[in-house]
Amino acid sequence: MLGGVMSSGRAKPGTALAGVMWSIVIPVKRLSLAKTRLCAALAASTRDDLLTHSPPSAVRPAAEDQLPANGRIALAMAIDTVCAAQACASVACVVVVTDDRLAADTLSTLGARVVPDAPDDGLNAALRYGAGLAAAHRPDAGVVALSADLAALRPGELTDALEQAAGHARAFVSDAQGTGTTLLSALTGTDLDPRFGAESARVHRRSGAHPLEGGWPSLRRDLDTPADLTVAARLGLGRATAGQLALLAPDLVSCAC
């Protein structure tokens, strides 16, 4: 379990280790509580009638009938993130930590291993729990915490980052602003030690995690604001997120084309 024995050795800095496999841990909030600020900002700047009311049931699955717009966007982003991670040859499994039933049902059908947020004590506790389960399931694989809102994520960029991460006991990728963290990795036998929150890039670096260097625009672009969505749309949104935004904020997507 990753919360246990620490690695006695260090990977040679800057050296990508061939054949390293990874378990990806993705935390997903309860959909009704996710992306509320993003949706509020979109409502103020685009078509607030669609962002504050559910679209006709004919254009979405019946299970989503009562899900607010913010929840539909959050679920779509999680779907695209999971699909991108699963497309990487070095990813052994994807573990989703969530207490949301719809998210669990949807993401499990994509092949993710879904576990409840048993600690129920915030993001870092959920990630520690998921990392422990992932390590128990695949003790031969390193563990990666990955943001659930990387809707434009390209598998090639994630693969490249994971290859670099294989050269460091712990490593991280900062977000586009350079202050947050979108990816945190730990090799087998090393404590993941997630410290997400305010200024997490600085905090992770101070904790000993190595900052990974690479352009990786889709890996660094988590989606918290309409401006983030516009940039992600230019990069190319995943199918699920693009479909939701075509319904909820078509003007934003069309402006990015």
Regions found by a protein language model. Give the residues of each.
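Intrinsically disordered, low-complexity terminal tails and inter-domain linkers enriched
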Residues: 1-19, 43-69, 136-139
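Short, glycine-/small-residue-rich phosphate/pyrophosphate-handling segment
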Residues: 182-209
